[in-house]
Swiss-Prot record:
Assembly: Part of the 30S ribosomal subunit.
Cellular component annotations (GO), alphabetically ordered: ribonucleoprotein complex; ribosome
Gene3D superfamilies registered for this protein in UniProt: Ribosomal protein S10 domain
Protein purpose: Involved in the binding of tRNA to the ribosomes.
Source organism (scientific name): Sphingopyxis alaskensis (strain DSM 13593 / LMG 18877 / RB2256)
Protein name as catalogued: Small ribosomal subunit protein uS10
Alphabetical UniProt keywords: Ribonucleoprotein, Ribosomal protein
Lineage: Bacteria, Pseudomonadati, Pseudomonadota, Alphaproteobacteria, Sphingomonadales
Superkingdom, natural source: Bacteria
Amino acid sequence: METQNIRIRLKAFDHRVLDQATTDIADTARRTGALIRGPIPLPTRIEKFTVNRGPHIDKKSREQFEVRTHKRLLDIVQPTPQTVDALMKLDLAAGVNVEIKLA
């Protein structure tokens, strides 16, 4: 039987919260005896929004806002059943989107 890999993709607006969640997942997986590849930083997506400053006529006066989405990738190679149980019980901070794929 071929061993399965677990690919975890994390997204967040705040990179500090994202890095903390990444280290929590990596420490949990290492503690249960699984091999880890990563964390791999993926490109940050920057969305920019331009709006008029005033409600009336002044088209030349504008303001720009941006939203940055930071991403990280973790590969867990040869996960043990204890690894899967520990990851299911792990409580991560709010604001971190977690996508898990079995490969």
